[in-house]
From Swiss-Prot:
Taxonomic lineage: Eukaryota, Metazoa, Chordata, Craniata, Vertebrata
Name of the protein: Ribonuclease H2 subunit B
Family: Belongs to the RNase H2 subunit B family.
GO BP terms: fibroblast proliferation; gene expression; in utero embryonic development; negative regulation of gene expression; positive regulation of fibroblast proliferation; regulation of DNA damage checkpoint; regulation of G2/M transition of mitotic cell cycle; ribonucleotide metabolic process
GO cellular component labels: nucleoplasm; ribonuclease H2 complex
Localization: Nucleus
Amino acid sequence: MARGADGGDGASVWQHVFLLPEYLKDDSKKMKSGLVFVKLANPCSGEGTIYLFNMCLPQLFEIKVFKEKNHSWFINESVQSGGLLHFATPVDPLFLLLHYLIKADKESFQGKFQPLDQVVMDDMFPDCILLLKLPELEKLLQHVTEEKEVDKKKYYKYSKEKTLKWLGKKVNQTMAALKTNKVNVSARVQSTAFFSGGQVSSDKDEDYVRYAHGLISDYIPKQLSDDLSKYLKLPEPPASVRNPPSKKAKLSDEPVMAKEDYTKFNSKDFKTVKKNSKMTAAQKALAKVDKSGMKSIDSFFGTKHVKKK
């Protein structure tokens, strides 16, 4: 079970720690529901994923989790186990819209022009209609759709050709960012580990393209990722690269899934002691110490008691 601060009535309060852009703090004060968590279809897998939606701008954020074992947070007068750190970073909403455009093109309308509000519909994830409130939506759609206007109403149809061109630009932008920040992509393609910026000179353009393609592929369906690979004319990776070892970075690449049980990330109860474990010499010496008058660290985080007069 999740452990948290004692609420006074025996109930545990589970809390999460987030890092957010500074301006979101002001937006949350302007509207009571300025920041809301929404469940939307993941553009890569199609599964339900939790996103953060800023109702003021509006703006969409994805959530990543930094996790390490045996870490906890001190929050006010409570200790929060697990030590998870959540990051909310802006995500291009066109990736999520693309999910519905491709789906409509394959299943429902099969190449027909349709109004957007009939394309972005989802009984499983009804909050998807929030995507229609995003600013400059029509300008975004020009990158991935063909457009027609009838009686001052616009109709859209998915365009694979335009989409690949747009994704190609995304790959180039990602490559530029990697080079600017001197990320050693050759090493990351091989082992997904970070190396010093001094080693960047050994990187090849193909490695940058391949790594950038991998990053973009986290936001598109696999079939489209394969099509993008062909569009970029990427050769098949060598056998040693196809199954690289696990990433050393602690920032999870997996999205925060909807209705996820956060307790699975928690470390085991640190109060549990192995029955057959032997005491060290230091532990034996500590056991002999007179502890009368000493306070447990737990006493500093428990509920305050008011003395009766």
